[in-house]
From Swiss-Prot:
One of its GO terms (cellular component) is cytoplasm. It is an enzyme of class 3 (hydrolase). The active site is at K280, R354. It holds the Pfam family Peptidase_M17_N. GO terms for biological process: proteolysis. This is Probable cytosol aminopeptidase. Binds 2 manganese ions per subunit. The lineage of its organism: Bacteria, Bacillati, Actinomycetota, Actinomycetes, Mycobacteriales. Presumably involved in the processing and regular turnover of intracellular proteins. Catalyzes the removal of unsubstituted N-terminal amino acids from various peptides.
Amino acid sequence: MTAVADRSLGPELARTETLGPDTDVLVIGLTSSENGPSIAPDDMFGDVLTEDVRAELLDQLGAVGAKGKAEELTRVPAPAALEGVTSVLAVGLGAPDKLDAEQLRRSAGVAARSLTGTEVVATTLGGIDIAAAAEGFYLGAYTFTPFRSAKSAPKPDERPVAKVEFLVPTADFGEEALFRAQLVAEAVATARDFVNTPPSHLYPAEFAARTQVLAEAAGLDVEVLDENALEAGGYGGVLGVGKGSSRPPRLVRLTYAGGPKKVALIGKGVTFDTGGISIKPAQNMENMTSDMAGAAAVIATTLLAARLSLPITVTATVPMAENMPSATAQRPGDVLTQYGGTTVEVLNTDAEGRLILADAIVRAGEDSPEFLIDVATLTGAQMVALGTRTPGVMGTDEFRDRVARISQEVGENGWPMPLPAELRADLNSKIADLANVAPHRWGGMLSAGLFLREFVPEGVQWAHLDVAGPAYNTGGPFGYIGKGGTGVPVRTLIAVLEDIAAE
């Protein structure tokens, strides 16, 4: 058993007041306007970017057609005055009035992906927003290579940038912001690592073991329930989903005790989802290695809460199972008893995530949290409704809106969705308390949210994030997002926890 890689293996992030002798490339920002591009920020780093250097750079950039459009990349030879620097990379930031933290994060990510084979980079982007720039550089440089042999391992000129130095105007500028940004980026990368690890190597017992290693190293309380403990405890949802696999399920609980206010995090941890007896189409089934992205996010967030010493208590309850078809698998038409006693008729074994989440939500409710957030790659309907980059956020109205707002502020773009009362009757069963799916395709994301609501304790502020599309990028890289696991919604979750802690 090997723990998830130490994310300190990402690029080193540092602050500097001067260009060092080892700097290979200087990264600057360009904004666009009708009058041509401008270097941003325009009021800092005059000792490095003197008026003459700025003029020379703008002449060179203009000569090769640089416009400053968002995420545009233009590389030119460094002016002689920038001693030791071989080239300058100008990354587009777009129009100044539209430049925000997320655009800067994306532009920094694009720059980082273009700097493979570079050892040391300096940048002025931190003068705009050092936290956003740092997150963008770190996450844009992310790679996942544990399963590459010497035959396909990255060559020196293919390796991500090793060190990013942020030019700062004073010695203490951005110190705390950079510290937090690196911790956040490392947490996102940890979630990505979990998601990108193939199911041959990340199955429930292994997922639980890796989580335990990380949690104990962070000083968290850890509880792991194996299949026998799950049976004894009556966790019918987790057991039902996992019974078709030769690799039995687990339920992991992590607790960071930082203060009296309690927040429960729940994450769907289906390490591979074939659909079970209601089997999925073979095409693209390999992407179901990502069906534990919700679990990865809440684990990484709980570890991050501890690293940031937030003054609240955060408990993650993470059910882990593999959904496989076999002679022992649950069948369409079976009835199972969830933790807490609710009976559910399983009409579709591919609607399994809600079954394991229901057990976890009831268990988490026994801790009397004030807030409860569950995260899951729950429905294909999320992508039909909102696309692949916009999480659906459901829950109690006030908290749902709060989580969605914060998600938009951090650039993960959660969107508030309703839980229409008229859809609830579609989850009635003729023989049990509930059916796990509605008898039609309409509003599938919302029906799943309504199902989960049945298990949320009364009076708890609750949010449900469906990240089926946003948690895993099957297309080409964009911004600071590469192919595979994205780490969404770690940045949303930690920002929500910080917001709760600040109340």
